[in-house]
Amino acid sequence: MDLSMLRAKLHRLRVTEADLYYEGSITIDEELLDAAGLLPYEKVQVVNVNNGSRLETYTIPGEAGERTVCLNGPAARLAAPGDEVIVIAYAELTPSEAREHHPRVVHVDENNDVTKTRTLDVAKETDENLAPDGMEDVLIAEGPQS
């Protein structure tokens, strides 16, 4: 059985444009794609922090250095310029591959300039967050608890 694992994430990009009449996708500055290890035309999930919408599309490289983040086609209805979005790519991995996997997370500022890049260690996180009583598959989530 394969697991769907986080592969790369661009965290809190600021939408700069929305083009309803383009045929579809999300245009992202190619330097940002490179920073996260995302490829042109790779399938991604886009989560809008401002309104909670989620969509799947694919990436199109934008002009390097322009810091463009543009939702195209019908996706343009789900975000407006100024909205913050999280762009996520996943990989299908076997459990043994997943334990050796190192997802990349890129943080940006309000101008879509990279402020921090992290490479996560799945094996370390799994070992440190195992639930008691041998429940290896139950991880404790970080962040505020309700």
UniProtKB/Swiss-Prot annotation:
**Top-rank taxon, per record:** Bacteria
Keywords of this entry: Autocatalytic cleavage, Cytoplasm, Decarboxylase, Lyase, Pantothenate biosynthesis, Pyruvate, Schiff base, Zymogen
Active site at 25 (schiff-base intermediate with substrate), 58 (proton donor)
The annotation note on the cofactor reads:
Binds 1 pyruvoyl group covalently per subunit.
Which Gene Ontology MF annotations are present?
aspartate 1-decarboxylase activity
Xref: SUPFAM superfamilies: ADC-like
Q: What is this protein called?
A: Aspartate 1-decarboxylase
Record organism: Salinibacter ruber (strain DSM 13855 / M31)
Q: Which gene encodes it?
A: panD
